[in-house]
Amino acid sequence: MATPAARSPFLEPSSTTAGVPRTPFPVPPGPSDITYVDGADRPPSGRLVLIGRDGGEGPNFGLRESLDIGRIEGVVILADDRYVSPRHARIVARRGSYHLRDLDSTNGVFLRIPFLRGNADPSISRKPLDPEQELGGQELFLLGQQVLRFEIVKNAEEGLGVASENGTLLFGTPATPRFARISQRTVEGVIRDVFHVRKAETVIGRESGDIVFSDDPFVSRRHAVIRVLPTQGGSGRRFTLADLSSSNGTFLQIREEVQLRHGDHIRIGQQLLRFDLDTTSPGA
């Protein structure tokens, strides 16, 4: 069965603490406030396209030196989405390219990671993230309706060892190592289920895999994979996340400013946006 292309809510709506006024982010300078020298650093023209629930293109917004996205403040106003913070994210032009920044939003900004195998859109020639994205712990990532947090377990959590009573070993299911855990976050702001990464490859999907979300129609049959790999020198472990050519993609929360590339998909609240550049303009 084909995976429907749609979006869904994921975290608790942004709110303002009662009685405490929210301090707005400073409004960035407009296009007339920035001067380019001989056009050397001028970025190509382009647009930010809002993708509808049916997968079709909605309103689009021309790129500028600084473009803010929010529920109340900014150039791109997503007024009907309560999962979007008042001023949520910013796209800024710098040294001939565009960069995406989270403005301390409640629910974060997520960027679609590349496919592990192939590329569905041949026009996307470059990517800001590697096909296998390194995970360092505490990352949030999205697939389908699922909001998942990845955490590396501490040494004390990896295994308790063999238990005994009065010198006799206790009978039980053989223990397996725990390298990391994946927590499922709900709209109530609490953790529902916790899954453990126990082997070299942990596949997440709707019908097959090690972690299965069978009731989520927006998750592909085999959607994403987390790999446990040796570090350089083999003395430790590292973890990667990759998308398995899913229909709706896997989105990783950005932790710092990220350079955008033509064709990138951005998740903000319930909204999906596509970053398009005019590849025929100077600087593209």
Q: Model regions: which residues?
A:
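Extended helix-rich, non-globular scaffold segments
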Residues: L272-L273
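Intrinsically disordered, low-complexity acidic Ser/Thr-rich regulatory segments
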Residues: M1-D81, S125-K127, E132-D215, T280-A284
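A short local loop/turn or secondary-structure capping micro-motif enriched for an aromatic residue
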Residues: R87, G108-F110, E151, E157-G159, ...
